[in-house]
Structure formats: structure tokens, C-alpha cells
Amino acid sequence: MPEFPEPEERNALAEDCRRCPALAGSRTRIAWGNGPRDADLVVVGEAPAAGNPDADRWRGGNHTGMAYTSRHSGRQVRRLVADLPDEAYYTNAVKCFPADPGDPTDNREPTAEERANCRPYLAAEIRDVAPEAVLATGKHATQSVLAAADRSLAGGFLDAVLDPVACPELGTTLVPVLHPSYEAVWRARLGYEDRADYVAAVRAALPSGGRRDSGDEDSG
């Protein structure tokens, strides 16, 4: 099981941000980025889910205040990174839970304005950490990272999976990966025999091929 982040790793850039009134009203806490500020990777998701306040410590960023701390997606993505293996800083393109007006326990897609309001935070995190690569989990996270680099997604998302994109505007390389909710379905359709095959392909797509896997066993 992946390690749960320590509270002091939480990188609150604006503790009570209210740029988006709807999100300020729907969130419980802002799910800020967390992890080493000199990490090899920055992992970017779309936005935190509602989470489960009654779960163990993996309650989700809406309750922990830290990105990628949900029981399903959070642990699954952290397990992927642990298997690469590299240290990672985890964040979301939109930091607050975007509640669906019809069902406040479910997510809606963040609006273009909400993405734009949060984009300076995302760009600041990436530039501050200065990772060798950014792993964007899913289409919307990929689009948000590209927008922060003044770029856009060319073609379909599945064609972009594990196809590195140099982002000199952010000083890093973007590597789109499958969203954890759909990984098991789509990795087979994309030709990966099993999870180990997919993890090896993710590692190979990184600029270093996986920092510790390429001769840096004793680092960190």
C-alpha cells in the first residue's frame, strides 16, 4: 500500500482562495498539492472528488486538504508512481471539489473559468518543483497542463497517452497517462498485456526512464 502524505507536505498557496464562488461553496477543504518540492515528477489530476469523511485517513482531498488522498484514485496513482519508481509531488488542475448541482455528492466537470482561475497555482507548482516530467492523469488534466504551457491537445487523448510533449514554457516534459478510473479498461485496448506492461511503458516514456531504475538506486 502506498504511503499516506504527511500533513507538513501540504503546499497551501492561498489558504482561503475564493476566486470561484461556486467551488468555495461546494468544497469542504482546498485540496492543495503535496510532496517533496524537489520531486522528480509532478502528478496532475483534474479535481478532487467529494470523498468520504467517514473513511480511514484516505478520505479524499476534499476532507484531507491534500490532493490524491482518496481510497481509490489516490492510492492507485500513488502505487503507479511507487512502481516507476520516482518521488512525486501530487496536485490537481482545480483544487476544490466541483459539486454537481443535481447531486452534491458527485463531481461535475470544472468550468473553463474555474480552470483558468486555478491555472496560475498549477503553473507555479510545476515551476517551483521543476520536475523532469509531469504525469497528467486523464484528458482534462492533460488539457490543463497544456493550457498552462500555452498549448492545446492535438487530436484525441488516447493517441496522446504516453507520448511525451516538451513544455519549455514550464521547463518540463508532459507525459499523459490513463485516468485511474479507466486504466484497467483502456490499457488492454491500447495493447498493454497487463498492469506490469503498462507500468513499464510509463517508465520508458519518462525522460530518464525512471530515475532510480536507471542507476540511482541509493538516491533519496
Please name every model-derived segment.
Residues 2-220:
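A polyanion-binding, active-site-adjacent surface
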